[in-house]
Swiss-Prot record:
PROSITE patterns: IG_LIKE (PS50835), TSP1 (PS50092), ZU5 (PS51145). The chain crosses the membrane at residues 383-403. It comes from Mus musculus. The keyword Cell membrane applies. Residues 404-956 are cytoplasmic. InterPro entries: DEATH-like_dom_sf (IPR011029), Death_dom (IPR000488), Ig-like_dom (IPR007110), Ig-like_dom_sf (IPR036179), Ig-like_fold (IPR013783), Ig_I-set (IPR013098), Ig_sub (IPR003599), Ig_sub2 (IPR003598). Residues 89-91 are annotated as: Important for interaction with FLRT2. This is Netrin receptor UNC5D.
């Protein structure tokens, strides 16, 4: 009974939809019939045996705020479609349906949709989400659609995990974590850097795909910034807290500087060296270098010992000139380690005949020689004993007549060293002191004196022509040389009895002066800072530095101050009775020598002339260059400009040639030439290791804007004339040198040059954007001899009260060397410490003529040439002299000269025009085995030049 009732109930429920469908269809038909509208047929053709097929099924949906959503279904063939939500049938009144015919198949298509509200979803409390599905009927049966879930969309406000700020070293890994807030549907994450979206597809170094995290594999300085995690879904967007990422650079030490000089002149002191934390400099809070920036060590300097006089000697025997004298020496003790020389006279002389001895209407006691050695006293005594006063008077009278006639017949200066008095108005500083025996190289073997010299001031003395000529003919300087050793103490031409440098001003002259010419050359002028420059019509018209001088048979030296360029005219290069106005110029305009291929100009273009002048012996031209010749990576050539303006190669520095000779020193090239013209040095790098030496310097000046300050960093060839052009430009712009220039080795490896400003004080100065680092292409630096190369930086003060500026200028070649210029200055001119452009000038005088232009006295030079020009069986000839003076190449050039030794000495004069290192020449002679005494051990204060005058007057 129960079973039958249950079956009946299930049967009733099974037929309930069909009954409802029937009554619904009947009511609908009646309604349409009552309205008179068209009634669709109850039986629509359908494919036999086909169940309803869903063309459109309901999709999952989200309710946003309070807006309802619509669920749709479409099926064919379908007589009716109903929605079932959460297992219950949706009421018929909530359905909206449409019917149509499928034109292709002729089947009936029915579409139904319902609305689901937020309230319906919230009121449902089931084990799963709110869901709905469609059920479609046909005469063959039913079909069900997929279940579509309906959820209320939301996005919570707070992130489950915000990204955290990081500080990482450069090239380190950065990982920023982000867990977005809970939401339906799940939020999508996007990363922002400084409010700009990050596209990981365009930057392979960044990955944002790993579980919403941001990963930067190798941190760069540009990766510093503020990072934000952005979460969004269909409801809202949420922003996380910003995370600051700082990529820092730890500082690194630069190389140590050289040790400084000892800070005391006497006793115990210290030396120091320093380094800077600039390799690299710390950035963005990076750690400063560990360790000390300055190191100090102790040092000891020898204390100076002042000299003291010994007791006076006995008075000498009365000489034929009615003079006797006594001497004392500064040897108790002698000055050492820079101590002061004894004050006072080293000798005293007086007339020993009560003024009765008369010479040429003047008492001889008015001629007061300043020094006489003990051996000279003994020799004077010998002369008095063996010669006799009567014979001396006769000899003097004969010599007076002979010398007077000789000098009147010659219009040029004599070639003897004593003739320099004609230029100095009677000032002489020659001195012989006979204290040692065995020096037959310089003096008469019978006399056997030593030669010592010093720098002293001598007043004008009255030397008569007869005595002068007697000294020329009888002086022991004309005896053959056997040994010599000389040491220079402090000044030009101190050793070997040659007077100090001085400039003699007078009227221009076209020829040399005869000995009898009475010109006003009695004043020795001080050093002149301005070169004497004379405009010549024959000089080129381009922009250039130039100087000129008049030279005769005695020769001389022409120097371009502060350029490193000089010209040496040897004694005898110009024939007697002739004199020439010789000029020298440096081209400062656009070089006329155009480089071919990899060839570069290494020196200035130097012109010397006149071009039609002929010389009897080669002259020496010194040209500065900027090549690093310490290693053999250059092929250097000497070139000359022809009259047609073209350049032709004279020789390669390493080649053998008999037409000219080139000696390459670290900073200059000394060339021996026979003809005047325009010359220059070019270089062709053999390898990428070839190095040009650049001089780097920084200048500064105020801008038109009172708050701005301009820095100009120059990189020019390391030649004095190139830097002098920079100085000239800066003087016109009002620039001031802020740091002493430094040397930078620039390789020929095609890598560019970088100039950057570092360590600018924050909150006081700022640099204009995008100018802190500037890069110069390799080609501009490698060929920078055309115009001075510089980089300009503009700094701005925050306030006008800022007057001090400190920063560092880093000049470095990529994959090469670098230099640091430390700027510490005041922008106020009244407080700024001036840095001189040149530590010392090249030469006091642009033109020096006669013996004063040479380091080696002419008489000594003659004896050296006479000795070494003679072939020697043991090989001790001019070739050995060349070898000992580091002249080992192209000796065939010297072999073609009439006096090889003279040309070697000319080259020595050109190389040592600055230091005057006569000791090196003396050492060379000693090594050859021709010297036995060392004159350089006799210190400068032990010698007085007046003794040389006295000995010459007495024929000693």
């Amino acid at each position: 009974m129960g079973t039958g009732a249950a079956d009946g109930s299930r049967g009733a429920r099974r037929w309930l939809p069909w009954l409802g469908l029937f009554f619904w269809a009947a009511g609908a038909a009646a309604a349409r019939g009552a309205d008179g509208s068209e009634i669709l047929p109850d039986s629509i053709p359908s494919a036999p045996g086909t169940l309803p097929h869903f063309i459109e099924e309901p999709e999952d949906a989200y309710i946003i705020k309070s807006n309802p959503i619509a669920l749709r279904c479409k099926a064919r063939p379908a007589m009716q479609i109903f929605f079932k939500c959460n297992g219950e049938w949706v009421h018929q009144n909530e359905h909206v349906s449409e019917e149509s015919l499928d034109e292709s198949s002729g089947l009936k298509v029915r579409e139904v949709f319902i609305n689901v509200t937020r309230q319906q979803v919230e009121d449902f409390h089931g084990p799963e989400d709110y869901w709905c599905q469609c059920v479609a009927w046909s005469h063959l049966g039913t079909s069900k659609s997929r279940k579509a879930s309906v959820r209320i969309a939301y996005l919570r406000k707070n992130f489950e995990q915000d990204p955290q700020g990081r500080e990482v070293p450069i090239e380190g890994m950065i990982v920023l974590h982000c867990r977005p807030p809970e939401g339906v549907p799940a939020a999508e994450v996007e990363w922002l850097k400084n409010e700009e979206p990050i596209d990981s597809e365009q930057d392979e170094n960044i990955d944002t795909r790993a579980d919403h995290n941001l990963i930067i594999r190798q941190a760069r300085l540009s990766d510093s910034g503020n990072y934000t995690c952005m979460a969004a879904n269909i409801v809202a967007k949420r922003r996380s807290l910003s995370a600051t990422v700082v990529v820092y650079v730890n500082g690194g030490w630069s190389s140590w500087t050289e040790w400084s000089a000892c800070n005391v002149r006497c006793g115990r002191g210290w030396q120091k060296r320093s380094r800077t934390c600039t390799n690299p400099a710390p950035l963005n809070g990076g750690a400063f270098c560990e360790g000390m920036s300055v190191q100090k060590i102790t040092c000891t300097a020898l204390c100076p010992v002042d000299g003291s006089w010994e007791v006076w000697s006995e008075w000498s025997v009365c000489s034929p000139e009615c003079e006797h004298l006594r001497i004392r020496e500064c040897t108790a003790p002698p000055p050492r380690n820079g101590g002061k020389f004894c004050e006072g006279l080293s000798q005293e002389s007086e007339n020993c005949t009560d003024g009765l001895c008369i010479l040429d209407k003047k008492p001889l006691h008015e001629i007061k020689p300043q020094r006489w050695s003990r051996r000279g006293i003994e020799n004077a005594s010998d002369i008095a004993l063996y010669s006799g006063l009567g014979a001396a008077v006769v000899a003097v009278a004969v010599l007076v007549i002979g010398v007077t006639l000789y000098r009147r017949s010659h219009s040029d200066y004599g070639v003897d060293v004593i003739d320099s008095s004609a230029l100095t108005g009677g000032f002489q500083t020659f001195n012989f002191k006979t204290v040692r025996q065995g020096n037959s190289l310089l003096l008469n073997p019978a006399m056997q004196p030593d030669l010592t010299v010093s720098r002293t001031y001598s007043g004008p003395i009255c030397l008569q022509d007869p005595l002068d000529k007697e000294l020329m003919t009888e002086s022991s300087l004309f005896n053959p040389l056997s040994d010599i050793k000389v040491k220079v103490q402090s000044s030009f031409m101190v050793s070997l009895g040659v007077s100090e440098r001085a400039e003699y001003h007078g009227k221009n002259h076209s020829g040399t002066f005869p000995h009898g010419n009475n010109r006003g050359f009695s004043t020795i002028h001080p050093r002149n800072k301005t070169p004497y420059i004379q405009n010549l019509s024959s000089l080129p018209t381009r922009t250039e530095l130039r100087t000129t001088g008049v030279f005769g048979h005695l020769g001389g030296r022409l120097v371009m101050p502060n350029t490193g360029v000089s010209l040496l005219i040897p004694h005898g290069a110009i024939p007697e009775e002739n004199s020439w106005e010789i000029y020298m110029s440096i081209n400062q305009g656009e070089p006329s020598l155009q480089s071919d291929g990899s060839e570069v100009l290494l020196s200035p273009e130097v012109t010397c002339g006149p071009p039609d002048m002929l010389v009897t012996t080669p002259f020496a031209l010194t040209i500065p260059h900027c090549a690093d010749v310490s290693s053999e990576h250059w092929n250097i050539h000497l070139k000359k400009r022809t009259q047609q303006g073209k350049w032709e190669e004279v020789m390669s520095v390493e080649d053998e040639s008999t037409s000219c000779y080139c000696l390459l020193d670290p900073f200059a090239c000394h060339v021996l030439l026979d003809s005047f013209g325009t010359y220059a040095l070019t270089g062709e790098p053999i390898t990428d290791c070839a190095v040009k030496q650049l001089k780097v310097a920084v200048f500064g000046c105020m801008s038109c804007n009172s708050l701005d300050y301009n820095l100009r960093v120059y990189c020019v060839d390391n030649t004095p004339c190139a830097f002098q052009e920079v100085i000239s430009d800066e003087r016109h712009q009002g620039g001031q040198l802020l740091e002493e220039p430094k040397l930078l080795h620039f390789k020929g490896n095609t890598f560019s040059l970088q100039v950057s400003v570092l360590d600018i004080p924050p909150f006081l100065w700022r640099i204009k954007p995008f100018t802190a680092c500037q890069e110069v292409p390799f080609s501009r630096v490698w060929s920078s001899n055309r115009q001075p190369l510089h980089c300009a930086f503009s700094l701005e003060r925050y306030t006008p009260t800022t007057t001090q500026l400190s920063c560092k200028i880093c000049i470095r070649q990529l994959k090469g060397h670098e230099q640091i210029l430390q700027v510490q200055t005041s922008i106020l001119e009244s407080e700024r410490e001036t840095i001189t452009f040149f530590a010392q000038e090249d030469s006091t005088f642009p033109a020096q003529t006669g013996p004063k232009a040479f380091k080696i006295p002419y008489s000594i030079r003659q004896r050296i040439c006479a000795t070494f020009d003679t072939p020697n069986a043991k090989g001790k000839d001019w070739q050995m002299l060349a070898q000992k003076n580091s002249i080992n190449r192209n000796l065939s050039y010297f072999a073609t000269q009439s006096s090889p030794s003279a040309v070697i000495l000319n080259l020595w004069e050109a190389r040592h025009q600055q230091d005057g290192d006569l000791d090196s020449l003396a050492c060379a002679l000693e090594e050859i085995g021709r010297t036995h005494t060392k004159l350089s051990n006799i210190t400068e204060p032990q010698i007085d030049d007046a003794d040389f005058n006295y000995s010459r007057q007495n024929g000693l």
